[in-house]
Amino acid sequence: MSATVDNTEANASPPKEFTLRSTIALIGAFMALFCTLGFQNAFGVFQAFYHATILRDHSEFDIAWIGSLLTFMIFFFAAPAGVLVDRVGPTHSLTRHLQPLLTFGAIATILATFMISLCKELYQFLLAQGILLGIGNAFLLCPAMATVTRLFDHHRGAANGIMIAGSSIGGIIWPIMLDQLLNKDGVSFGWTFRIVGFVVLPLCLFMVATIRPAPKTPHDSDREGIELSHGESESDHKAQGAEGPAAIIKNPTFLILCAGLSVATFGLFSPLFFISTYATDQGLSVSLAFYLVSMLNGASMVGRVSTGFLADRYGNFNLCFLTIASSGLIAMCWTKATNTVGIIFFALAYGYTSGVSPSDLKKNPPGPNTAVAGHVQSPNPVCRPALDARVEGGCRRHSLCRASNSVSIVLFSRIARSCRLTHSYSGLVGTPISGRLLKHGYLALSMYSGAALLAGAGLVLIARLRQNTKLMAKV
């Protein structure tokens, strides 16, 4: 019987993945990250603009809560959004063309964008740009990323790379667009955000129309039948599949890794949020300060690609530790950049190291904290593959469990939700702490950011040594 199964699996040719339908869905997912994480990555522009104009009576600490709340809501609501994706599917239809999860996310995102254009007070920005936009973004991201994961298997690395690029490209384009509108064309803040809303509106309509799961094929049915033909009940397979996630949640190495990445998140966003205000304080023009955010995000995209190849050669844990530690050291050198060339170099260097993400996602599938992929939602994805085998051991025999393991790439497993929640709290309080420290100068801010990253790197190093104590080993 086993020989028959093996022959059947060997002879079964995988279906073509880059079809017209799947390619259009991939473009829709790219747009989802462009409009959500790409826009979030541009918050440094708003930090500087709000402090200089609309919210000039408020401190950097107060204004930083807007971006921190946005980050928190995206991470926090990834958990319930993930549960709904697990239960009803990423684009489950009440009617043929109604896709409630994506539709809710699109409506909330568009509504928040237009509501921001009416904001005058800090609490209004917190409600619109912090809470409502964050919730909408979470419900756009999760279905989009889940759909790509389910559409692509053999070419998942390329598909995820294209999708994730949307966040970096958004982080480059949005600051340039905002600078052109606010600083050069003299468009009012209200109309600037209305223009942003009119840009996001057709993109959201495109997402809702195109992000659809692949129809079930005979290949899928045959494979599921093969996997359930060993004489064991489906409940037995589910019980075996549950052992993997339960085991890794109790794994000390995984817990130390999550702790390290959460600690690093406290300082991770500080340069991204405050580099524009730092540049203007050093005498750089407002336009160049806006462009620094684009430069930082552009460098993060380069780092995301190149470090993926290095991770394949030298090991995932090793690169994870080195990039977090490098980010911490660069952050501590922040205030040594006092002229135009130095500040640009700092933005490029920090963007490169903090934007690390695996490029070969097929060989090294991302783990619980892929972020949501945008800029620096933490370098942890490269560390997950070393732990994946422990999960897959209990899951590979059942298609439903194996699908659940794939969906963990976009935060929908119990492992992913628990680790993402810890990141949400770190992201919530980390940047406001940076804003509070600004009254003591940017040196205090840079030391805080660097210390948090180095402390997180230390915990990641402990997790790495638990995997293999040999310093030169590929882990």
From Swiss-Prot:
> Which residue windows are transmembrane per the record?
26-46, 65-85, 98-118, 125-145, 158-178, 189-209, 255-275, 283-303, 329-349, 443-463
- What ranges does the record give for the region Disordered, renumbered to this chain? 216-242
Please list the residue ranges that the record marks as compositionally biased, kind Basic and acidic residues. 217-240
User: What is the first-listed, main subcellular location in coarse terms?
Assistant: membrane
Q: Is this entry keyworded Transmembrane helix?
A: yes
Q: Note whether Manganese occurs among the keywords.
A: no
Identify the GO cellular component terms for this protein: plasma membrane
Q: Which InterPro entries does the UniProt record give? A: MFS (IPR011701), MFS_dom (IPR020846), MFS_trans_sf (IPR036259), Proton-linked_MCT (IPR050327)
**Where in the cell does this protein reside?**
Cell membrane
Q: Name one GO molecular function term.
A: transmembrane transporter activity
Annotated keywords: Cell membrane, Membrane, Transmembrane, Transmembrane helix, Transport
In what way does this protein cross or attach to the membrane? Multi-pass membrane protein
Pfam families per UniProt: MFS_1
> What family classification does the UniProt entry report for this protein?
Belongs to the major facilitator superfamily. Monocarboxylate porter (TC 2.A.1.13) family.
- Purpose of the protein: Efflux pump that may be involved in the secretion of leporins.
Name of this protein: Leporins efflux protein lepC
Source species: Aspergillus flavus (strain ATCC 200026 / FGSC A1120 / IAM 13836 / NRRL 3357 / JCM 12722 / SRRC 167)
